[in-house]
Structure formats: C-alpha cells, structure tokens
Amino acid sequence: MALTVSSDSINPGERVADAHAFGVPDGNGKAAPEGGNRSPHLSWSGHPEGTESFAIVVFDPDVPADASDVNQDGKTIPADADRVDFAHWLVVDIPADVTEVAEGAGSQEIVIGGKPVGETSFGGVSGANTFTDFLEGDEDMEGTYGHYDGPFPPFNDERLHHYHFRIYALDTPSLGLSGAFKLDDVNAAIEGHVLDHGEIVGEYTLHADRL
C-alpha cells in the first residue's frame, strides 16, 4: 500500500487558495504580500512497516534560477527559463504516530522577518524555508523564515507554478538536523532513509494573463 496524502485545504491540480498564499494579486497587474499565509491541512496514510518518522517538504520546482528579472516592470520571465526548487515548508522528525497536521499549525499569517525555526506544535522540527535566502538584503522583509510561508511567484513569470506538498516516511526517528536547516540539508539527510513518499500538487500564479 502506497503512502497517500490528502488535504481539506488543497485541491490537487487546482489553484491554491489565497488563504494559503503569501503573495496575492494587487489589482494593478502586480502582487502584494497580503495573502492569508495559513499553512494547509495535511493528512497521510498507508505508510510502510518500519516507519520511524515523517518529514514534510513543500516546494515549488518552477522558480526562476536567475532572479535578476523577478518582479521587474517591463520584463517578462519566459516559461522555458531555467528553474530551481524553492522550499516553502520543511519539517523533519515528525513522530511516526502523527499522521495529520491541522490547518494553521505551521503558520497563521504573514510574519514580516519570518517565524523562528525549531519545534512545531504537532511534533518534529522546522527548518528555514527559501524566503530566508530570497529576501536577504531586503531591509523591510529579510530574516530567517521558519515553518510555512505560502506561494508568492513572480508576477511577471509566464510559467504556472506547481506546489508539491510531499510527505516522506523514513526509517529513522531523527535526521539529526537543527537550527536553520534548508532544503539541501533535508535532501542530503534523507538519502538512504526513505521508505516511501506521497504528495499532492497545487498550482498558483500571479501573472495577470493567467488569473
């Protein structure tokens, strides 16, 4: 039996609701950090025997590798531009008896400067999402962004972005990660420990022609 992920908040293959987004359309063809930014409900079942812990990895694989034209007036990021993964939520060491996370457990709202990394309300430890890196140097927004922060793709990006809400079943109770660990750290730590994984995928864009 494969690990199956479901959600009361995310409809697979459909647009992620503004309630779970960081950025939303501003009505003038651009975007603003005014979404609800609530982490979605997630539940999972069918994990294999021998599962010692779970990890949540929420990521967008459609983020432009070159950020120089991101959200720039008069510039367009073509759909075929090179892309990289952008983490929106990283939680490891979730106890094996936890198979559901309530809506809002990873974020209730936008916190300028980020939420602290560390222990979660449902068990496990949260690292730093990629807004930590993306907003570095922005005097108004920079900080360490722990726990969940939702979609905020460039308003001038022609590509539809896909948000993978992935659960890993692992054969170890702890990956040994702490502090502001990032997506690369999780990917390296789970190597050789993944028993199974499942996911649901939502979509989001802020490009005016796709709204």
Where are these regions (language model features)?
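N-terminus-centered regions that define maturation/targeting leaders and the start
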Residues: 1-211
